[in-house]
């Protein structure tokens, strides 16, 4: 039996109608973990602290938009937990399953009729005087920008410890193949 964490975006799933529908469909077919904040729903699931939701999960199902996946991508990558996205947003590049197709897609998933698409991620480190100030992983992009009203900022970009370029600018955007699609569309270009 698959162990599945379910994370809804409650601003897109009003009243958690689709989350309830998903849980009811999964009941008896999978072990389900969901944030204890939703215990008032009285669903037949394992309620756990939000910070522990991925501790027992083999898979994550997200109900929301691409932003909901992006919030969890780094943690899931670190734990090697595949993410299945159910689109409640507008475009849904990463949340590829439309809500009307949810039961069919989940049935295939439960029968192991799926492939896992691996996506490149970046590790970013923000350094000042060669000391790491901040470090994180990104699935979409890394954006460095100056504070409003400040002058241009000096940046040095390196990959795997090798200097690539130096920039003096008001910002820099570095996108993965996943993130570049959004920038292409914003500029009136095609889906990449």
Cite the ranges covered by each PLM segment.
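Short glycine/serine/threonine-rich phosphate/pyrophosphate-binding segments
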Residues: 15, 67-72, 181-185
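Redox-cofactor binding/interface segments in oxidoreductases and associated redox assembly factors
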Residues: 6, 62, 70, 174
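Gly/Ser/Thr-rich active-site loops/lids in small-molecule metabolic enzymes
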Residues: 162-192
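ATP/NTP phosphate-donor binding region
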Residues: 1-59, 100-115, 126-136
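N-terminal glycine-rich "phosphate-gripper" loop used for MgATP/nucleotide binding
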Residues: 62-66, 73-76
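Proline-centered loop/turn at the N-terminus of a beta-strand
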Residues: 31, 80-82
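Short gly/pro/ser/thr-enriched loop/turn and capping motifs at secondary-structure boundaries
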Residues: 40, 89-94, 190-192
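Catalytic core of DAGKc-family lipid kinases
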Residues: 91-170
């Amino acid at each position: 039996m698959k162990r599945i964490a379910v994370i809804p975006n409650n601003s897109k799933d009003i009243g958690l109608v689709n989350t309830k529908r998903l849980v009811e469909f999964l009941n008896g077919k999978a072990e389900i973990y969901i944030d204890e904040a939703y215990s008032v729903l009285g669903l037949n699931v394992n309620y756990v602290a939000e910070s522990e939701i991925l501790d027992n999960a083999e898979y994550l199902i997200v109900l929301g938009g691409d932003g909901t996946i992006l919030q969890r991508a780094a943690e899931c990558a670190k734990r090697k937990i595949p993410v299945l996205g159910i689109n409640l947003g507008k475009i849904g590049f990463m949340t590829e399953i439309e809500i009307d197709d949810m039961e069919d897609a989940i049935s295939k998933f439960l029968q192991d009729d799926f492939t896992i698409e691996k996506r490149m991620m970046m590790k970013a480190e923000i350094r000042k005087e060669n000391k790491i100030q901040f470090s994180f992983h990104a699935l979409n992009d890394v954006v460095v920008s100056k504070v409003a009203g400040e002058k241009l900022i000096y940046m040095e970009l390196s990959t795997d410890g090798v200097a690539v370029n130096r920039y003096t600018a008001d910002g820099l955007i570095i996108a993965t193949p996943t993130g570049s699609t959004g920038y292409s569309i914003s500029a009136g270009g095609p889906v990449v």
